[in-house]
C-alpha cells in the first residue's frame, strides 16, 4: 500500500487581542488553487453586485460575510463561481448543500496530480479526460471547477431528482458547461456504480463527497459544533445548516465508512472501466476499514492524499486495479 502525503505548512498560532490577525494566504491549499489568497470582496462585488448587502465588518473589524448565515454563504459561492469560473447563472434549492468552494477545488487539483503520476508526471488535460462525479448534488461544483481548470468532461450521477434537476438547470444556463457535463439519475439507490457506468464505458477517475454521518442526529451535532466555532453560542435543537444539506447528502446508515466500503466492493466489477476510484474521507479513523476493504477487493494500489485548509486536515482515498505498467498503457491510449 502506498500512502502519498504532501508537505503541509503549519499555521502559526494567532493571538487575539482587539483585532484578529489573518495571513494573506490560506495555509495549506494546493499551489494551483485560485482561492489561496483571502477573499477580495470589492472584486467579488464588482463581479456579483448581489453579494454587497451580505458584506460587512465582522467582530474583528475585517470585511467579511456571516458564515453562519446560509443566504450569505450561498451568495458568496455565487460570486466566487462568477468571478473565478465564469459561471453567470448559478442557484440551488433551499436547504441543499452549498459547499465551500476552496476545499472542493483542492480535491480536483490533487486529483489532477494523482492522474499525473500515471502519465509520467504530466497532468492530462482536455475533453479526452472523463471524470465521474458520484452524487453531483444540486450545486454542480466539481464539473464547474474541473472544466475551467483542466478542460475535463464530467458525468454526474445522483439519486435525488431535485438535485439532478438543479444541476441540469446550471448546465443548461451556462454555455461553457453544456457540451461537457452529462447527468444521470441513479434509479437504484442501493447501487453506486451499477446502473451508471456502461459496460464499455471508460472513466479516468471517479470522485465523491460521501454522506459523512451515520444518522440525522450525528449530522445535527456536527452543525452545532460548527456554529459554536463561528461564535453563535447556544443553537436550536435542529440548527440551520450554514452550508445546507439534505439528509441523503449528509448522512446514511453506517456513515462514510459503510458508504465507501460499498463503493470499493462495487468497483471490483468496474475495474477495467476506470483508472482511479476516489472518495473524500472525513474521519481519519475510517481509513483502516477502507484499506481492509481494498485489500479484500484485490486492488493493485491504494493512496491516501491529504489536504489542508488552514488548521483543518482533510483527505481522499484513491485506489486502482491497474499496476504501473497498465497505468502507463491507459495513459498512452487515452491521453496522448
Swiss-Prot record:
Principal location: cytoplasm
Protein's UniProt name: Ribosomal RNA large subunit methyltransferase F
A GO biological-process term: rRNA base methylation
Record carries keyword Methyltransferase: yes
UniProt xrefs under Pfam families: Methyltransf_10
Superkingdom as given in the UniProt entry: Bacteria
GO cellular component: cytoplasm
Keyword Transferase assigned: yes
Enzyme category, top tier: transferase
Keywords noted in UniProt: Cytoplasm, Methyltransferase, rRNA processing, S-adenosyl-L-methionine, Transferase
Amino acid at each position: 500500500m502506498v500512502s502519498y502525503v504532501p508537505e503541509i505548512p503549519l499555521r502559526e498560532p494567532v493571538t487575539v487581542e482587539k483585532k484578529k490577525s489573518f495571513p494573506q494566504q490560506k495555509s495549506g491549499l494546493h499551489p494551483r488553487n485560485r482561492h489561496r489568497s483571502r477573499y477580495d470582496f470589492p472584486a467579488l462585488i464588482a463581479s456579483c453586485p448581489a453579494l454587497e448587502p451580505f458584506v460587512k465588518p465582522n467582530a474583528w473589524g475585517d470585511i467579511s460575510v456571516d458564515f453562519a448565515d446560509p443566504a450569505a454563504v450561498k451568495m458568496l459561492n455565487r460570486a466566487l463561481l462568477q468571478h473565478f469560473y465564469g459561471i453567470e447563472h448559478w442557484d440551488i434549492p433551499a436547504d441543499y448543500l452549498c459547499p465551500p468552494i476552496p476545499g472542493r477545488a483542492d480535491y480536483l487539483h490533487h486529483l489532477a496530480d494523482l492522474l499525473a503520476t500515471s502519465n509520467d508526471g504530466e497532468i492530462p488535460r482536455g475533453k479526452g479526460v472523463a471524470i465521474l462525479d458520484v452524487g453531483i448534488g444540486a450545486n454542480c461544483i466539481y464539473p464547474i471547477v474541473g472544466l475551467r481548470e483542466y478542460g475535463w468532461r464530467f458525468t454526474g450521477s445522483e439519486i435525488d431528482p431535485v438535485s439532478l434537476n438543479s444541476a441540469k438547470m446550471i448546465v443548461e444556463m451556462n454555455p461553457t458547461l453544456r457540451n461537457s457535463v452529462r447527468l444521470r439519475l441513479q434509479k437504484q439507490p442501493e447501487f453506486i456504480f451499477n446502473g451508471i457506468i456502461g459496460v464499455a464505458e471508460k472513466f479516468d477517475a471517479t470522485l465523491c463527497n460521501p454522506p459523512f454521518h451515520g444518522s440525522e442526529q450525528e449530522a445535527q451535532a456536527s452543525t452545532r459544533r460548527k456554529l459554536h466555532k463561528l461564535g453563535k453560542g447556544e443553537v436550536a435543537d435542529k440548527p440551520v445548516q450554514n452550508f445546507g444539506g439534505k439528509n441523503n447528502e449528509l448522512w446514511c446508515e453506517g456513515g462514510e465508512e459503510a458508504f465507501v466500503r460499498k463503493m470499493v466492493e462495487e468497483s471490483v466489477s468496474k475495474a477495467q472501466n476506470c483508472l482511479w476510484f476516489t472518495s473524500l474521507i472525513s474521519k481519519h479513523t475510517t481509513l483502516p476499514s477502507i484499506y481492509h476493504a481494498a485489500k479484500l477487493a484485490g486492488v493493485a494500489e491504494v493512496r491516501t492524499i491529504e489536504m489542508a485548509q488552514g488548521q483543518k486536515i482533510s483527505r481522499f482515498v484513491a485506489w486502482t486495479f491497474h499496476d504501473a505498467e497498465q497505468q502507463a498503457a491507459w495513459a498512452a491510449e487515452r491521453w496522448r
